[in-house]
UniProtKB/Swiss-Prot annotation:
Annotated function: Involved in late steps of the endosomal multivesicular bodies (MVB) pathway. Recognizes membrane-associated ESCRT-III assemblies and catalyzes their disassembly, possibly in combination with membrane fission. Redistributes the ESCRT-III components to the cytoplasm for further rounds of MVB sorting. MVBs contain intraluminal vesicles (ILVs) that are generated by invagination and scission from the limiting membrane of the endosome and mostly are delivered to lysosomes enabling degradation of membrane proteins, such as stimulated growth factor receptors, lysosomal enzymes and lipids. (Microbial infection) In conjunction with the ESCRT machinery also appears to function in topologically equivalent membrane fission events, such as the terminal stages of cytokinesis and enveloped virus budding (HIV-1 and other lentiviruses).
Pathological condition linked to this protein in its record: CIMDAG syndrome: An autosomal dominant syndrome characterized by global developmental delay, severely impaired intellectual development, poor or absent speech, microcephaly, growth retardation, poor motor skills with inability to walk, hypotonia and spasticity, and cataracts. Cerebral and cerebellar atrophy, thin corpus callosum, and delayed myelination are apparent on brain imaging. Affected individuals show hematologic abnormalities mostly consistent with congenital dyserythropoietic anemia.
Extent of Basic and acidic residues compositional bias: 84-96
Effect of substituting residue 64 to D: Modestly reduces interaction with CHMP6
Keywords associated with the record: Acetylation, ATP-binding, Cataract, Cell cycle, Cell division, Congenital dyserythropoietic anemia, Cytoplasm, Cytoskeleton, Disease variant, Endosome, Hereditary hemolytic anemia, Hydrolase, Intellectual disability, Membrane, Nucleotide-binding, Phosphoprotein, Protein transport, Transport
Protein name: Vacuolar protein sorting-associated protein 4A
Enzyme nomenclature, EC number: 3.6.4.6
Pfam assignment, any one: MIT
Encoding gene, per UniProt annotation: VPS4A
Length: 437
């Protein structure tokens, strides 16, 4: 296997240099990048002596350097008729053309990242988030107060610059971030995921990370929200790719590196699996807030929020009974229960074999009461007419209101999504590194 992997790398490099000489630069770039991947694999798993590793590493640097020059040339070729960079061209000789192409590249990367800026506010207020008072207070401390009362945060009293929200799935971490985007109306809110920062071009991903932070500093006060931060900043290990390692290193440098002033910039991360985060990244998140499963009072509030203005006849006692029965359910689970129960009246209409006339508000003029609306009923009801929903005129249907039996039926068919084992892992992480919300 040693011979085949190393030989494959050598064959690829040979083809790359041939394509390079033939001025097929796109193909040459692709082959150089593939060759480097094979060489790195050989260094990691197959080269046993330090001398062999050093020799392969030196070759990698040489081919990467050529790949970078080809990549710069291919990018700039569309904009200017730029001549190819000679293999033996020195840094000094290429400085003029490099400086010409550098700004457009930076501008292009920043334009790409501008898509991550949340231009429209989500319109979710603190009151729309049930419970999580500790998390809300920490976010107000970090985001709202420094903007409203900047004189409070002078000298050694500085706002938090890195906050990690962690907890089981569906507990409201991303929802809290939306509330921050709404409430921090003077801040620029960047919402990024791994897809915004990953690139097929070698070396471009870390440039995107760097430009993201530069863009945030230019538009401060700003918030960078990274959902599922574990996908970008997992623990460093032997098996990860060079690109992943470089992205992680750039994150570390930008979040708290020498020469980077992040005043007015908050990095807000969210994850369901905090135990896989790299320890250095974990340290950069100064405040680590555990977002637990909702307590009974918060669950009751969630039922009310999700029911909203939909017609229903549930009493406070019914709501509290539902809250008691949903121990171990996340906010997302409760949302699904309510959404399913709101569909129960529609299912009653679909399955009904009899309808009866009732009095209710007109569809065209809700202030006017009319007495010829039709609603589903049992065959034994007085005035029951045998018909299906297909026979009911579109403006004459009065759907049943949501009732407790609808909620219980939906609850019986919806199981909690949070696994007991995962919950134990999150609680263990919270005991070791977190703060309760």
């Amino acid at each position: 296997m040693t011979t085949s992997t190393l030989q494959k790398a050598i064959d690829l490099v040979t083809k790359a240099t041939e394509e390079d000489k033939a001025k097929n630069y796109e193909e040459a770039l692709r082959l150089y990048q593939h060759a480097v991947e094979y060489f790195l694999h050989a260094i990691k798993y197959e080269a046993h002596s330090d001398k062999a590793k050093e020799s392969i590493r030196a070759k990698c640097v040489q081919y990467l350097d050529r790949a970078e020059k080809l990549k710069d040339y291919l990018r700039s070729k569309e904009k200017h008729g730029k001549k190819p960079v000679k293999e033996n061209q020195s840094e000094g000789k290429g400085s003029d053309s490099d400086s010409e192409g550098d700004n457009p590249e930076k501008k292009k990367l920043q334009e790409q990242l501008m898509g991550a800026v949340v231009m429209e506010k989500p319109n979710i207020r603190w009151n729309d988030v049930a419970g999580l008072e500790g998390a809300k207070e920490a976010l107000k401390e970090a985001v709202i107060l420094p903007i409203k009362f900047p004189h409070l945060f002078t000298g050694k009293r500085t706002p938090w610059r890195g906050i990690l929200l962690f907890g089981p799935p569906g507990t409201g971490k991303s929802y809290l971030a939306k509330a921050v985007a709404t409430e921090a109306n003077n801040s620029t809110f960047f919402s990024v995921s791994s897809s915004d920062l990953m690139s097929k071009w070698l070396g471009e991903s870390e440039k995107l990370v760097k430009n993201l932070f530069e863009l945030a500093r230019q538009h401060k006060p700003s918030i960078i929200f990274i959902d599922e931060v574990d996908s970008l900043c997992g623990s460093r290990n032997e098996n990860e790719s060079e690109a992943a390692r470089r992205i992680k290193t750039e994150f570390l440098v930008q979040m708290q590196g020498v020469g980077n002033n992040n005043d007015g910039t908050l990095v807000l991360g969210a994850t369901n699996i905090p135990w896989v985060l790299d320890s250095a990244i974990r340290r950069r998140f100064e405040k680590r807030i555990y977002i637990p499963l909702p307590e009974e009072a918060a669950r009751a509030q969630m039922f009310r929020l999700h029911l909203g203005s939909t017609p229903h006849n549930l009493t406070d006692a019914n709501i509290h009974e539902l809250a008691r029965k949903t121990e171990g359910y996340s906010g997302a689970d409760i949302s699904i229960i309510v959404r399913d129960s709101l569909m129960q009246p529609v299912r009653k209409v679909q399955s009904a074999t009899h309808f009866k006339k009732v009095c209710g508000p007109s569809r065209t003029n809700p202030s006017m009461m009319i007495d010829d609306l039709l609603t589903p009923c049992s065959p034994g009801d007085p005035g029951a007419m045998e018909m299906t929903w297909m026979d009911v005129p579109g403006d004459k249907l009065l759907e049943p209101v949501v009732c407790m039996s609808d909620m219980l039926r939906s609850l019986a068919t919806t199981r909690p999504t949070v696994n007991a084992d995962d919950l134990l892992k999150v609680k263990k992480f919270s005991e070791d590194f977190g703060q309760e919300s």
